[in-house]
């Protein structure tokens, strides 16, 4: 959208806020120039939609003074005007000079640090992407960064005396970290430089901090006091990342940090009271976890040798059926005894599997015994003696008929036996009579 602004007075002194609502960039790709240069706020995928539905705000009634315009960065930018005015930023400007000044404000890297990187600034709050609920994740990330830096600087204050040279490097690194998250990862402090002492040393190592380190976050003292006054607070969260600030602000790594903190708290509860003082000391590794005692698992040999019960049983008369039953029962009892000899503690699943296995073995044994009984009954029937494929129903019917015929024959034989006994008695009595007559 072209700039259509007309001023009656060329030397009219206006503040940036009174003219800002009328300014728009000429080209579409420069609409998010401030966000593209800082790389902290990537351009939204719906730039055209934002421009289409953007309403022109009304100018304020009275010009307000921004903290960014009064900051040293604003004063540092004004002498770099291409016009080379001798005003030095203190006199009246023409319309062209004001336009160039606004362009430099939008494109200057030094001003971007004060306008964009400061979460408390009004420009940061009035940003389009910050106001959108879908793209407001950066606000939470900046809040997390400020909290981490506050705890980081508070821990550095308590750990030792300040060192000016190292404090300057820490300040520069932290400011660069606020400016660019990806660039700060390569400029972090070496842990060996900050903590030159070993882990087992009782004395705390001297760490570097700057005199004005509290300027990074206004809530550093409040965070430190809340951490010390909380009865449930653990000394471990301050020790998690002392040597370097976090290098990412994604949700997945925030969840990982939360899980690690919970893990540290749970481990600290298991430790003895004497070891808690040692766990509170800072270390180069960050996380302090006690060595876990190895679990001693005793294993026992479970007999898995099983016969192939699915194979067709042999009908040969090698040994009697009673001997077969005895051998099978001995084999099953031996398997059960081998399972009971295992003295190691098992879970409920292992016990259930053993019970199921034992039940399956006993069920197979019962079926095999029933099958052998049918085969033995078939061998006793004369009609089915040589028929190995006789069904069980035929075997039962033939066996019933055979039993009835045997019972009828038995009754006949019993009656014959009675007749023969009577005949014998008669013959004995007649023999006695003959002996008496001869005598």
UniProtKB/Swiss-Prot annotation:
Residues 413-434 are annotated as: Leucine-zipper. Residues 266-278 have a biased composition (Basic and acidic residues). Phosphorylated by PRKDC. Phosphorylation at Ser-329 by PIM2 leads to the stabilization of MYC. Phosphorylation at Ser-62 by CDK2 prevents Ras-induced senescence. Phosphorylated at Ser-62 by DYRK2; this primes the protein for subsequent phosphorylation by GSK3B at Thr-58. Phosphorylation at Thr-58 and Ser-62 by GSK3 is required for ubiquitination and degradation by the proteasome. Dephosphorylation at multiple sites by the PNUTS-PP1 complex promotes MYC stability by preventing ubiquitination by the SCF(FBXW7) complex. Residues 251-263 have a biased composition (Acidic residues). Residues 335-347 have a biased composition (Polar residues). The modification N6-acetyllysine is found at residues 143, 148, 157, 275, 317, 323, 371. Residues 206-294, 335-360 are annotated as: Disordered. The modification Phosphothreonine is found at residues 8, 58, 315. GO terms for cellular component: cytoplasm; nucleolus; nucleoplasm; nucleus. Keywords: Acetylation, Activator, Chromosome, Cytoplasm, DNA-binding, Glycoprotein, Isopeptide bond, Nucleus, Phosphoprotein, Proto-oncogene, Transcription, Transcription regulation, Ubl conjugation. The keyword Phosphoprotein applies. Residues 354-406 form the bHLH domain. The modification Phosphoserine is found at residues 6, 62, 71, 81, 151, 159, 161, 293, 314, 329, 344, 347-348. Its main location: nucleus. It is found in: Nucleus, Nucleoplasm; Nucleus, Nucleolus; Nucleus; Cytoplasm. A motif (UBR5-degron) lies at residues 355-364. PANTHER family: MYC PROTO-ONCOGENE. Efficient DNA binding requires dimerization with another bHLH protein. Binds DNA as a heterodimer with MAX. Interacts with TAF1C and SPAG9. Interacts with PARP10. Interacts with KDM5A and KDM5B. Interacts (when phosphorylated at Thr-58 and Ser-62) with FBXW7. Interacts with PIM2. Interacts with RIOX1. The heterodimer MYC:MAX interacts with ABI1; the interaction may enhance MYC:MAX transcriptional activity. Interacts with TRIM6. Interacts with NPM1; the binary complex is recruited to the promoter of MYC target genes and enhances their transcription. This is Myc proto-oncogene protein. It comes from Pongo pygmaeus. The gene is MYC.
């Amino acid at each position: 959208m072209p700039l259509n602004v007309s001023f009656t007075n060329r030397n009219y002194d206006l503040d940036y806020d009174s003219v800002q609502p009328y300014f728009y960039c000429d080209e579409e790709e420069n609409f998010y120039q401030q966000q593209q240069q800082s790389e902290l706020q990537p351009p939204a995928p719906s730039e055209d939609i934002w421009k289409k539905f953007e309403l022109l705000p009304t100018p304020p009634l009275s010009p307000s003074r921004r903290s960014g315009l009064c900051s040293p960065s604003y004063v540092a930018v004004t002498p770099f005007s291409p016009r080379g005015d001798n005003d030095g930023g203190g006199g009246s400007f023409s319309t062209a000079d004001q336009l160039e000044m606004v362009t430099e404000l939008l494109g200057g890297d030094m001003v971007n640090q004060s306008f964009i990187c400061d979460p408390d600034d009004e420009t940061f709050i009035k940003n389009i992407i910050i106001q959108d609920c879908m793209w407001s994740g950066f606000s939470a990330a900046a809040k997390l960064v400020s909290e981490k830096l506050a705890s980081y600087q508070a821990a550095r204050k308590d750990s030792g005396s300040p060192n000016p040279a190292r404090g300057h490097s820490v300040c520069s690194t932290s400011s660069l970290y606020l400016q660019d998250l990806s660039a700060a990862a390569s400029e972090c402090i070496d842990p060996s430089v900050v903590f030159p002492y070993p882990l087992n040393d009782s004395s705390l190592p001297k760490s570097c901090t700057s005199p004005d380190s509290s300027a990074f976050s206004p809530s550093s003292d409040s965070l430190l006091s809340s951490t010390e006054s909380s009865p449930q607070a653990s000394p471990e969260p301050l020790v998690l990342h002392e040597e370097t600030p976090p290098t990412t602000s994604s949700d997945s790594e925030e969840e990982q940090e939360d899980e690690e903190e919970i893990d540290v708290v749970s481990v600290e509860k298991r430790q003895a009271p004497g070891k808690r003082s040692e766990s509170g000391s800072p270390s180069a590794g960050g996380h302090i976890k006690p060595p876990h005692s190895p679990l001693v698992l005793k294993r026992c040999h479970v007999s898995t040798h099983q016969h192939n019960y699915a194979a067709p049983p042999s009908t040969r008369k090698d040994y009697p059926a009673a001997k077969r039953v005895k051998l099978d029962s001995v084999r099953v009892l031996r398997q059960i005894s081998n399972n009971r000899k295992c003295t190691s503690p098992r879970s409920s699943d292992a016990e259930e599997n053993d019970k199921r296995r034992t039940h399956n073995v006993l069920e197979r044994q019962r079926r095999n015994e029933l099958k052998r009984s049918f085969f033995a009954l078939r061998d006793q029937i004369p009609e089915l003696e040589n028929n190995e494929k006789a069904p069980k129903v035929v075997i039962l019917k033939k066996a019933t008929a055979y039993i009835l015929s045997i019972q009828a024959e038995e009754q006949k034989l019993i009656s014959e036996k009675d007749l023969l006994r009577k005949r014998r008695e008669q013959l004995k009595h007649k023999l006695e009579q003959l002996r008496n007559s001869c005598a």
